[in-house]
Amino acid sequence: MSYFNTNETFFVIPLNSSDGEIRKINCLFDILEKSGVGEIIESANYKSSNIGRKAYNPYKLFAAIIYCFAMHKGTLRNIEEMCAYDLRLQYILNQNTPSYKTILEFINDVVLPNKEAIFSKITKTIIDEFNLDIDDCYLDGTKLEANANKYK
């Protein structure tokens, strides 16, 4: 079952970098799809009742949150603002604009209880897809040494 996809056509204002950004978003969707994160989100039963307003697509909401964190927009208000004004987020969310309260409820109800399972699956998929070697640990491009700053 395909959880992370965009089936609708979307009018994007022609920008020089729009094709590259769409490719990045589709790569994000591919990684999320291959990781099996959709099954975890589905098992969380987010907003499963039919009472009230129609719920946002939880898979696309998760992809939007991940994309915002990748763009260093980590606060709820920044995520809400990006969802409202950023074309990339409008592409991901099919032009829906969730409020910061909706994003907060989704993070508290779905992401936080399942954070270890979600992010371990995503990490394993990224390692497998890009053939990364995780034997050596690097932080900010500097190899960690056992005797760092030890002068003889």
Region roles according to the model:
Residues M1-N26:
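Hydrophobic alpha-helical membrane-insertion signals
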Residues P14-S18, K54, L112:
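Hydrophobic alpha-helical scaffolding
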Residues G20-I66:
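Basic, short loop/linker segments at the boundary and entry of helix-turn-helix/winged-helix-like folds
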Residues L28-L32, C83, L139:
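Short amphipathic alpha-helical "interface-anchor" segments enriched in bulky aromatics
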Residues F69:
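Short, aromatic/basic-rich helix-turn unit that serves as a nucleic-acid recognition element
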Residues N78-Y91:
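DNA-recognition alpha helix
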Residues L93-K152:
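Active-site- or DNA-interface-adjacent structural scaffold in DNA-acting proteins
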